[in-house]
Amino acid sequence: MKKLIYLFLTVLIVACSGEDGGNDQDNNDGDNNGDNNDTTCEYVLNTLTVTNATTDSATFNGIISLEGNCEFPIIEQGFVYSTELQPTIADSKINVNGNDVTTTIENLEPNTTYYTRTFLTNDLGDFYGNEVSFTTNETICDVVYLDENGITIKAYECAEVGETGVVNGVTYTVVDEAMLREMIADEEDVTKIATTKVTDMSAMFANSPFNQDISSWDVSNVTDMWAMFTSTNFNQDISSWDVSNVTDMTIMFKSSPFNQPIGNWDVSNVTSMQAMFWRNTSFNQPIGNWDVSNVTYMAGMFEGTVGCNIIEKSKFSQDISSWDVSNVTDMRNMFSNGKFNQPIGNWDVSNVTDMSWMFKNNHNFNRPIGDWDVSNVTDMDYMFEVAKSFNQPIGNWDVGNVTNMHSMFSFATSFNQPIGNWDVSNVTDMGDMFRQGTCCCGYPGLEVYYDFIGTFNQDISSWNVSSVTICDDFSFNTPAWTLPQPNFTNCTP
């Protein structure tokens, strides 16, 4: 009975010791998890005020002390807080030393009511002061802002689709993919929009006359740019675009006049650049610093238009010797119908399986590529057809896995290198392989005819052509070739 009286007196002393402390006038509710036998000690627990409340933070103020002859010292003290009434140390807590205690709590939720109390813990248990409530401010969304690059307009995460915001006196509208595609279909002005919420821009402007200034677009969340500007009139500066999350750039600028500096783009996540500049007869910008280490498809990347008209050829001929192409598997048509003539002999092409048409109708290329590891290539048909300048030693190539060499050197008038040691035992098609003579190119009805007189004259009689079943016109119209040729047994050359 005496013990219960002591506890009652202690709680009464604590409850009466504080000052008026805010919304909750009960300075101490007397909660404790133990018996208070510290009868000559006064526990002062006063939650005073909560100040400086923002959307995610607030400052707590209070008094915590022991007065008198206190047998049990404080082990820890501070504030507890929660979105529920009567918070305890089982909720959120923060320790604060001293008598006049003040601390700022962060990472709170906006527009939310919280409850806080002072607390102390000693060997007798946990004790709490009066409760004070407060509400954090509601989030005010500014909608859009100017990126640190000074060009890109970005939308805040809190911004809603359709909302507008002003940057430097210009009003921008937040859009998502559906809204953006509808605007484009209606031929609206899309120069004053925030595209932060758009992740897919595939075929966004395909087959349209689009040519608006969209340099301020935020494409940092876009992953797909497949066919984005295919067959458009687009030729605007988009060098500031953050394309670091894009994985697909297939036929992105196909058949467009685009020729802008994009050499600083981060393309490290792109896996496909297939036909990226196909039939783009304008692009010729330095992109040698691109990180293409994740690209697997480069087929037709710089391929010009079909035909031989010099005006329609791809103009691209920039130094890309430092590209890491070790993951590329497909290089067919990569430089066909173009003017490319840069050193790429140090490329690691060991994973490439298809080099068909790679330099077809490229009249300029003549760089050493004899050290290439082509051991995984299976298709070399038309690889150097009408590559009129190429004449580099490639006799050490391991072509043991190649099955198709159709028209590989047809109309390649300069090529005359020893390749008699090649292992062609798996090749089945050698039709037109060294064919020379008259050839036409261009569009039906607009053909241009050329006479090709080759110089190839090497002994390749040791070739194992036992697997070849197609060899028609193998060496058609090659008057310069006087040295022994292969002995075909399964077809007639």
Where are these regions (language model features)?
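Positively charged n-region of N-terminal signal peptides that target proteins for export
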Residues: 1-4
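Negatively charged
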Residues: 138-493
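N-terminal processing/targeting junctions
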Residues: 10-15, 114, 308, 449-450
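Terminal export signals
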Residues: 6, 16-17, 102-104, 196
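Phosphate/oxyanion-binding loops and surfaces in catalytic or ligand/nucleic-acid-binding neighborhoods
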Residues: 19, 82, 477-478
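Residue-level signal for mature regions of secreted extracellular proteins and peptides
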Residues: 9-10, 34, 55, 63, ...
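Bacterial Sec-dependent N-terminal signal peptides
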Residues: 6, 10-44, 137-141
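Short, surface-exposed linear motifs at loops/turns and structural transition points
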Residues: 22, 38-138
